[in-house]
């Protein structure tokens, strides 16, 4: 378990099926399933959102991000992913399931 309560290696994360993704120019937004919240995604969150098209573990996300940006320290990659996933989970934009 990490500091956010996710098992990085075994918990799969996926998009909530009713969450809507919108791109407006260079900006990316999520519209909450209840339609009452809109959140702007930073580039890292948008990239992770795209990776969650199918259920995926944080570990698998970190492997992909690390391969794309090998200069980044692995601990920083994992920390950033954990933070984004925690926020998206707490806001109800994504769901978790066991591997």
State each model region's role.
Residues 1-34:
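Long, low-complexity, charged/polar intrinsically disordered regions in eukaryotic proteins
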Residues 34-99:
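Long, charge-rich, low-complexity alpha-helical segments
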